[in-house]
UniProtKB/Swiss-Prot annotation:
It comes from Aliivibrio fischeri (strain MJ11). The gene is astD. GO terms for molecular function: succinylglutamate-semialdehyde dehydrogenase activity. NAD(+) binds at G220, S221, A222, N223, T224, G225. This is N-succinylglutamate 5-semialdehyde dehydrogenase. It is an enzyme of class 1 (oxidoreductase).
């Protein structure tokens, strides 16, 4: 039983899919995907459940969500273990994901009250009222890199606002979503309020094409996001929120301060989660000269000693595997392409078996036309620069705009950087992957269109209803011109 539809666990009727553990290629989950008809059933179940769910007082919806939060706390280690087995991320890291799920629930409850409150005031003898109403049935597309945390950041705000949900997780992490859906079931969620459909592209297309959805919250690749954007073009009746990737720049000033602290910040920016975070640094801008040379030498020395291993290794790894062997091969092929364009290897990314890839660093300064691509893995491109203005200009030369960062102890450099850089998340002397759950997450350009995550997700899960109210109809002292009564 791999799908949760209308409160029942059912088997799929489509093609067989399976989840392979990327660090040993063992099958950890398998089942049949949902057919178009089953997706339609899930959407219909959500539509039917919406009628009563939206009427339920907020306090009742909150109570169910908070029971779910307690279940996540109680099962945090088992959730983390499943995520580690499916993604290959170190166990210590997946434990933080389970904790983040709970933290985002508290943020979402606060956001509901602060972003979508009930307000009323008097104006010119009228009562002006602002209410918020749920959109209806929300489709949620989850990514593989944070298969618990990121869908949770859409599902919880949607439910709190009174929407119902159909979740389609990544086909590479179906097990995680199944485990989490069973916790929602234990929390006492009414039948049909959340529905889970598993599958690959055809299942996703069926859900995105379903007439019964009112909105779609997507986290994933730019390519898939752009397909959805074109598909929804002209359909003003549905809300589409896209969180996609980035070709994120990190600029290191000559005034970078402590050498090892800077190197640590770069490593955390580029190689955390084996480079599989959408905010990871992809391009590193380093000043020409001796200070830049020393920085790169130290960075290479530290990076080549990064411990890469299985999630549960006795010697705790910093990095795990890529999500799949195909993803690992993509990084190695990207390295070859950059070399062919004139890139010089400072540290070669190597295959370590199964889906493991060691971190790589390539000097792309002499690449005449650097591809504007997101290499979703542990491959860092270095570009040398002469002035901060040049570095910022190069950093902005991308169709993306998710995250960017400056390492500098000079306040005037930061003032210049934050004024001229184009990105939605901009950090100073902190890793690019650092983001607050109660701040907007996203950026302009090909990185997405809205910021439907964490605190600001409330904005996209309800629409404002403005009312001008009176106890009874009135006749004004002076009628409008041309009227007689």
């Amino acid at each position: 039983m791999t799908h949760w539809i209308a409160g029942d666990w059912v088997s799929g009727e489509g093609e067989m899919i399976q989840s392979l553990s990327p660090y040993n290629s063992e099958v950890v989950w398998k089942g049949e995907s949902a057919t178009e008809a089953q997706v339609e059933s899930a959407v219909n179940a959500a539509r039917n459940a919406f009628i009563e769910w939206k009427k339920l007082p907020f306090e009742n919806r909150q109570a169910i969500v908070e029971r779910f939060a307690e279940l996540v706390k109680d099962n945090a280690d088992s959730i983390a273990e499943v995520i580690a087995k499916e993604t290959g991320k170190p166990f210590w890291e997946t434990k933080t994901e389970a904790g983040a799920m709970v933290g985002k629930i508290a943020i979402s409850i606060r956001a509901y009250h602060e972003r979508t409150p009930y307000k009323e005031r008097e104006a010119a003898g009228n009562k002006i009222v602002l209410r918020h109403r749920p959109l209806g049935v929300m489709a949620v597309f989850g990514p593989y890199n944070f298969p618990g945390h990121l869908p949770n950041g859409h599902i919880v705000p949607a439910l709190l606002a009174g929407n119902t949900v159909v979740l389609k997780p990544s086909e590479q992490t179906p097990w995680t979503s199944e485990v989490i859906m069973k916790l929602w079931q234990k929390a006492g969620l009414p039948k049909g309020v959340i529905n889970l459909v598993q599958g690959a592209r055809s299942t996703g297309e069926a859900l995105a094409n379903a007439k019964g959805i009112d909105g779609l919250l997507f986290t994933g690749s730019a390519n898939t996001g752009h397909i959805l954007h074109r598909q929804f073009a002209g359909d003003t009746g549905k809300m589409l929120a896209l969180e996609m990737g980035g070709n994120n720049p990190m600029v290191i000033s000559k005034a970078f301060g402590d050498l090892d602290a800077t190197v640590y910040t770069i490593v955390q920016s580029a190689f955390i989660s084996a480079g599989q975070r959408c905010t990871c640094a992809r391009r590193l801008y380093v000043p020409e000269g001796e200070k830049g040379d020393a920085l790169l030498a130290r960075l290479v020395d530290v990076t080549k000693n990064i411990h890469v291993d299985q999630p549960f290794s006795e010697t705790t790894p910093f990095m795990g595997s890529q999500i799949s062997i195909a993803a690992a091969e993509f990084i190695l092929n990207a390295q070859k392409k950059l070399q062919a364009l004139g890139g010089e290897l400072l540290l070669e990314a190597r295959s370590l078996g199964h889906a493991f890839v060691s971190p790589g660093i390539i000097d792309a300064t002499n690449v005449a036309e650097l591809p504007d691509e997101e290499y979703f893995g542990p491959l860092l491109q270095v570009i040398r620069y002469t002035t901060l203005a040049q570095a910022v200009e190069l950093a902005n030369d991308t169709r993306y705009g998710l995250s960017a960062g400056l390492v500098s102890t000079d306040d005037s450099e930061w003032d210049y950087f934050v004024e001229h850089i184009r990105a939605g998340i901009v950090n100073r002397n902190r890793q690019l992957t650092g983001a607050s759950g109660d701040a907007p997450f996203g950026g302009p350009g090909a990185s997405g269109n809205l910021k439907p995550s964490a605190y600001y997700a409330a904005d996209y899960c309800a629409y404002p209803m403005a009312s001008m109210e009176g106890d009874a109809c009135e006749i004004p002292e002076q009628l409008s011109p041309g009227l007689t009564l």
